[in-house]
């Protein structure tokens, strides 16, 4: 057995979200259409550069109110797929409640190793801290959220002093099973690198509140990752809690953030307020 009683084929299947959700491709197509519509309807500052690499850029959608808080959203895709444009639809929920939304893009594997990706997210948040005031935002109220790989990257950003709180959605917090399955063909993690970049093994000594959310219809390994991380977070005396979303799978989870009245939107607002 390779990991927790699973052989390689079983471990591959345990992290294959697209195979587990038959409607995944249709959902992704729907996200793209809704994201394009939001970008047409909401004037945003797009492709703001936080670094010199091609994918070191972010989009910033501003709420109507001045000095608004900002949530920086980090997209998923197992660190090797997708871009910020495909997740613009998520901005609708927070914007409706007067929260700015920054969508962060980053260099993907195999062009980047994990530590570079983690570093890029930290750099993007630092850019927001420095430049939000130029757009009328409040740099003292920066929050971070992310889905799947973005949930992992959200967790790695929680130790930054400028981050006031976070929402980690369907994330990966222990990278050892990732190192051992098909995802590592592009990630190229070795054992030490997986350990260094596993949030479960490197909890901050001080942080703002973190909500760790997962869908009860997700793959069991994805559920376990969130449950284990939330427990470790709380056991370390850090503020936050676990938030299971009943009946949600890995993809439908995000509807609870896109919806202005969704469970994840409400959780984010509670962190901010």
Where are these regions (language model features)?
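Alpha/beta-hydrolase superfamily serine-hydrolase fold, recognizing
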Residues: 1-273
